[in-house]
Amino acid sequence: MANYYLGVDMGGTLIKIAIVDDKAAVIEEAVVNTDINANPKSVIENITEVFKKFKNYNKVKTIGIGIAGDIDFRQGIVRLSPNLPKWNKVQLKRDIEKITGKTVYVDNDANTAAIGAYWLDIKAKADNMICVTLGTGVGGGIIINKKLFRGNSGTAGEIGHITVEPNGRKCNCGNYGCAETYIGVRHIVKETVDLLKTNKSKYILKLANNDIEQITPKLLSQAAEKGDVVAKKVWNNAGEKLGILLSDIIDFFNPDYIVLCGGISNAGDLIIKPAKEQIKKRAFKTAAKACKIVVSKYTSHLGVVGAAMLVKN
């Protein structure tokens, strides 16, 4: 008889919930909207009500939750979450265990994405990998010998704050030149808007209906594929910074795989090709040759599956 685990991926706009078996296959799933203004108690009550609607809920052994922010994974406390401004020192593990009577695990969403990528993309191929999440921010999760590596205080994998441009753009963390300030969604869109002030674009504004608020990474990919010079420049710049970041990761960890996930990874070769050119120039050749860089085939499920499989980490 298969073991069942429940996973929760708490995002800034959506909360994904799924029951997963011991082979990481999704058995049941649901999606609910995230109310960022709601207090933690009401959010917890709402998602636990969703749990009970699953027909296999009574078979669930453990619950795992992935959430962005500063997480005390040992105590299951959300110290701070950028997606949920009212979540400050929330005893998430304690509160959900009290309601459900089941053991609960809580971790950073980049870590749960890494666990998901290992189980869904890599498990049959290798034991060591780095997952790089490319979205609003840039994050990472580290799998060594099939297990998540968290570091002393659970903050290992904060690769979005590795410097890729000394004395570069100021980051929200207080540092300058962090990878996140060049590869994150907000910064890619901002760079596009800045370039449009002095450069002619054939497709970007046309696709955006002359509204810069409609510019997205997906739109930029569409424009670049049509040959738009500005869009191609934006992706090339982001790809170069990504390549600098990945070169550091390759040199430091010598992983079998780097798995890219998140919305920015959907740009594919537009960002990966210039990244690989930088890796060829910068990374230690033996390590670079041994490392395969792939885009996850399961981006939409990595977080929720990884959360469910926290019990195994």
Question: What residues fall within each predicted segment?
Answer:
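A charged helix-plus-loop insertion that forms the helical arch/lid used to bind
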Residues: 78-89
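ATP-binding/phosphotransfer module of carbohydrate and carboxylate kinases, centering on a glycine-rich
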Residues: 1-62, 72-77, 93-102, 116-126, ...
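Catalytic-core segment of enzymes that process non-peptidic bonds
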Residues: 143-144, 148-149
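Structural signature of FAD isoalloxazine-binding scaffolds in flavoprotein oxidoreductases
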Residues: 155-158
